Design a protein with these regions (language model features):
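Feature captures outer-membrane beta-barrel proteins of Gram-negative bacteria and organelles
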Residues: 1-5, 37-48, 60, 91-101, ...
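Outer-membrane beta-barrel domain signature
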Residues: 27-30, 80-84, 116-121, 152-153, ...
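A short secondary-structure junction signal
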Residues: 70-75, 104-108, 121-124
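Transmembrane beta-barrel strands of outer-membrane/channel proteins
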Residues: 10-12, 58-64, 109-115, 152-158, ...
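Transmembrane beta-barrel domains of Gram-negative outer membranes and organellar outer membranes
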Residues: 1-87, 91, 99-102, 137-139, ...
């Protein structure tokens, strides 16, 4: 958004009907037949270093809070209620602190309390933790310039342990993201960012 303290995201997941699916009719097998749309938002309550250099950033966020009923009709439903499509509903309060290592990079430490209320999944109220390291070598060679686009990540998201990386190709406008969810399930993609400010 145009406000540095507010982040809003729209996620559209295309659903592929696999051959032999018992949910989708046979004529749709092998095709993308549906989509799941979700919004998320993060509100920065406190900026890192506002009061003292050591103070962390504090963020309040939500993912996939409501959807239209899966049977049509246009009514809004939330969380694990009957008829919802909220497969990623969660609310969280997060704290983040970054430490700079001159001519090497920046280490981020993150902790949150998460309330998960997604449809068809275990509901939980528990902490999550993460860490990342973004390289920041002096740009004296092509290798150090290339390494500076790399951000290594690891997390416990209140349900699973995940490891991955993000690589920025062009000034944080185009990023490659890859992850092993629960240490074994690969997911990846390209992220295109539009900076409004």
């Amino acid at each position: 958004t145009i406000f540095p303290w507010l982040e809003v995201s729209y996620i559209c997941t295309l659903v592929h009907a696999d051959h032999g699916s018992t949910y989708f009719p046979e004529q749709s097998w092998g095709k993308f037949t549906n989509q799941d749309r979700a919004f998320s938002a993060r509100l920065r309550l406190w900026k890192e270093g506002w009061w003292k250099e050591w103070t962390p950033q504090i963020v309040l966020g939500l993912d996939d809070p409501t959807s239209h009923a899966d049977h049509g009709g246009g009514e809004l439903v939330a969380g694990n209620t009957s008829g919802s499509n909220n497969y990623a509903t969660r609310y969280y309060l997060a704290v983040t602190k970054h430490l700079n290592f001159q001519n090497i990079g920046e280490w981020g430490v993150h902790a949150a309390f998460v309330y998960g209320n997604a449809k068809g999944m275990e509901h939980y109220k528990r902490p999550s933790f993460g860490t990342n390291f973004r390289f920041a070598f002096p740009e004296t060679s092509i290798i150090s310039k290339a390494a500076n686009g790399l951000n290594l990540m690891a997390e416990y998201d209140a349900r699973t342990c995940n490891v991955g990386f993000e690589y920025s190709f062009w000034k944080d406008y185009v990023n490659l993201v890859a992850e092993l969810n629960n240490g074994k399930y690969f997911s990846g993609g390209l992220v295109f960012k539009v900076h409004l400010k």
